[in-house]
UniProtKB/Swiss-Prot annotation:
It comes from the Eukaryota. The gene is TPS7. This is Monoterpene synthase 7, chloroplastic. It catalyses: (2E)-geranyl diphosphate = sabinene + diphosphate; (2E)-geranyl diphosphate = terpinolene + diphosphate; (2E)-geranyl diphosphate = alpha-pinene + diphosphate; (2E)-geranyl diphosphate = beta-pinene + diphosphate. Its cofactor is Mg(2+); Mn(2+).
């Protein structure tokens, strides 16, 4: 069989040669032009293999719909920018005025974080918390009778990479009873702060584990007992926190909720509230522009039209990137991650649904070797898949080399090769009807969920990346595995029923049921315990030695938060209408008033 390709001139895939796969400028290289129109001519007709279908819904976010999104207050953007600058200056003055008042400083920092504007004051907050960390024992004594302040101090330090001991809460335990003091049971604010702090538990921290059980029980009692909690902000916060703790929430959506709740609090700061509103809407406009840009790229690429078997979810893929890193200076990562997410979905559907086993073996081999010269062995649709990934990775590698003088391509190649190898292993399991043990499944499932590729992309596209940072990435940092495992298990919880119906490999719950001969409810409870253990490991890795490490750790922590957002109530990724559409509207389209 002979195959010829007719390459359209509109969308260009650059063939990049050179040492280590490093990209050279497009003018100096040969070009592969293969999209959006591809014509395949066969010299002989052979019977097409039987293809499965995922029966996915088409995207509700068409290119025209995305391009029609309007920016809020566009005529006043310059004025809003000046107002934000003025309000930032006022907030800096406020931080100066509160020096020496530790409790008030802690409350202000907490408000800045929850209002989503702490990134404007990163250095000032870090310096303040560094001082608190140096005086931790003295401040702890100062707050010996104040549960709220003690828990807030503990949480803010841990959230920002300072390793502090759970022993700060021993003073709130009754030595004779061996449990938390009875007087705390009615302190709603203190209980709520301790509840949120308890979700930063590390391995072996029994006191925080006790604190979670204690606060959960008594916060529920306060909500249920008539007259215990009057209507107001604290009641809203308690109900909201019991649904999902702060440490596991999608930050931008939480910010929008908190702005709405805090503005009804009579003690709120009007200037700080205005800063949060203006900043939220300014970032929302930025996100709309970014989404417009990646939508043009996606439309020019033409993959959904040429390969209609996979899930076309550009807007959702961009939203993943916003969850990972929302700040303005992370656009390079958001752009590359959106593209990577699109390709992950495409290739995942090739392995899970569309490809034959023989085709998948060939594709895996070529991805491992990163060998563009071998693509003639592939069927036409796989050539398109390979070239899309190959050229996008190499183009990103060229830009990073040009701007920073470091070669990220080997690290992205490694991540793509590992992903495809794990996809291949699971495809063999499916085609042979094999059900692995839970440990055997999980051993590779944290790779096959694509988290390591996403985090490799985050690492390589970080704005402060240096050669020294890249050298450290020869092996994955310890935070990567628990982050990816949580992504995997959230995904399995939300999608396994639908994926099994399409013909996918057995997931964590089914592997546990098969191995232990237990019903689904028991298996799910066991997987929940595995997830809690991984959260403890993840929390234990929140110690950053540099701004770059802090950025990367934040992305790693946001990975399971994104999974909770998309899969907490089913498959909010594949089934992109309903709740997911509401959240997209809230974050990307509807400004705060």
């Amino acid at each position: 069989m002979s195959v010829s390709l007719s390459f359209a001139a509109s969308a260009t895939f650059g063939f990049r040669g050179g040492l280590g796969g490093f990209s050279r400028p497009a003018a100096a290289i040969k070009q592969w032009r293969c999209l959006p129109r591809i014509q395949c001519h066969s010299a002989e007709q052979s019977q097409s293999p039987l293809r499965r279908s995922g029966n996915y819904q088409p995207s509700i976010w068409t290119h025209d719909r995305i391009q029609s999104l309007t920016l809020s207050h566009t005529a006043d953007e310059d004025d809003h920018g000046e107002r934000i600058k003025l309000l930032k200056c006022q907030t800096n003055k406020l931080m100066e005025e509160k020096k020496g008042e530790v409790g008030e400083q802690l409350q202000l920092i907490d408000h800045l974080q929850q209002l989503g504007v702490a990134y404007h004051f990163k250095d000032e907050i870090k310096d303040t918390l560094r001082g608190f960390y140096a005086s931790f024992e003295d401040i702890s004594l100062q707050f010996k009778d104040n549960l709220h302040a003690s828990a807030l101090l503990f949480r803010l330090l841990r959230e920002n990479g300072f390793s502090v001991s759970e022993d700060i809460f021993k003073k709130f335990k009754d030595d004779q009873k061996g449990q938390f003091e009875d007087r705390l049971q009615s302190q709603a604010e203190g209980l709520l702060s301790l509840y949120e702090a308890s979700y930063l538990e590390k391995d072996g921290e029994e006191l925080l584990h006790e604190a979670r059980e204690f606060t959960t029980k008594h916060l529920k009692n306060l909500l249920e007992e008539e007259g215990s909690l009057k209507p107001g902000l604290i009641r809203e916060q308690v109900a909201y926190a019991l649904e999902l703790p702060l440490n596991r929430r999608f930050q931008r959506l939480h910010t929008k909720w908190f702005i709405g709740a805090w503005q009804r609090d009579p003690t709120m700061d009007p200037a700080l509230l205005l800063l949060a509103k203006l900043d939220f809407n300014a970032l929302q406009n930025m996100y709309k522009r970014e989404l417009n840009e990646v939508s043009r790229w996606w439309t020019d690429l033409g993959l959904p039209q040429k390969l209609p078997f996979f899930r076309d979810r550009l807007t959702e893929n961009y939203l993943w990137a916003v969850v990972f890193a929302f700040e303005p200076d992370s656009w390079a990562f958001r752009e590359m991650d959106t593209k990577t997410n699109c390709f992950i979905t495409m290739i995942d559907d090739v392995y899970d649904v569309y490809g034959t086993l023989d085709e998948l073996e060939l594709f895996t081999d070529i991805m491992e070797r990163w060998d563009v010269n071998a693509i003639d062995k592939l069927p036409e649709y796989m050539k398109i898949c390979f070239l899309a990934v190959f050229n996008t990775v190499n183009d990103a590698g060229y830009e990073v080399m040009r701007d920073k003088g470091v070669n990220i391509i080997p690290y992205l190649k490694r991540a793509w090769a590992e992903l495809c190898k794990m996809y291949m292993r699971e495809a063999r399991w499916y085609h042979t009807g094999y059900t692995p043990t839970l440990d055997e499944y999980l051993d590779g499932a944290w790779i096959s969920i694509s988290g390591a590729l996403i985090l490799s992309t985050a690492y390589c596209m970080g704005k402060d990346l240096t050669k020294e940072d890249l050298d450290k990435f020869s092996t994955y940092p310890s935070i990567v595995q628990p982050s990816c495992m949580l992504l995997r298990l959230h995904d399995d919880f939300g999608t396994s029923t639908e994926e099994l119906a399409r013909g996918d490999v057995q997931k964590a719950v089914q592997c546990c049921m098969h191995e232990r001969k237990v019903p689904e409810a028991v298996a799910r409870e066991h997987i929940k315990q595995v997830m809690e253990a991984k959260w403890r490991v993840l929390n234990g890795n929140r110690v950053a030695a540099s701004s770059f490490e802090e950025y990367f750790q934040n992305v790693a922590i946001n990975l399971p938060r994104a999974a909770q957002f998309f899969y907490g109530k089913g498959d909010g990724y594949a089934n992109a209408d309903g709740e997911t559409q509401k959240q997209v509207m809230s974050l990307l389209i509807e400004p705060v008033q």
